């Protein structure tokens, strides 16, 4: 499994709140946020971190990432405002067409069973899957900074970033930040389509 973590965003809300470190390097419960994210995927070591070149130059981000995942590859890209899909396209040359891929956000935590998730998607021979949740979660009382999924019988119909499909967002599935693809070529094909639409 290749885990790709786009983490090249500026993190404007955190800067505005007074944080000095880039969001993935903020310490929560004695670990960086990015270490918590990596711990969501036990025994996985094939990582690509797509990072903002300024964060790599001006912080110890590279050393921290290499300490967490020594065999990881780090891709440095210029500051942009095109989002995580764009960032992942900058690592296409490191993705094999036939390997399984998870694209993971760099700034979340979740309680889940990774082994069960993998077993489920592999048994169903799913081309893709998104780990989602719904119901009351305290963070839902605030902003809509989540990707909401429209589904029918647990099959994804549509996903929308930062905007729920209905007025009752707590009854909708929201992505936790984990996107599974059975083949790397699916990542390349569909991420390119998204970028070409913009």
Where are these regions (language model features)?
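Conserved N-terminal catalytic core of the sugar/cofactor nucleotidyltransferase
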Residues: 2-5, 13-15, 19, 27, ...
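Short hydrophobic/aromatic segments of transmembrane alpha-helices and their interfaces
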Residues: 8, 16-17, 169-171
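Active-site glycine-centered loops adjacent to acidic/histidine catalytic or metal-binding residues
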Residues: 9, 107, 134
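Short connector loops/turns at beta-strand edges and beta->alpha or beta->beta junctions
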Residues: 9-12, 186
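Conserved core of the sugar-phosphate nucleotidyltransferase
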Residues: 111-194
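Short, charged, surface-exposed loops that flank catalytic or proteolytic processing sites
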Residues: 196-198
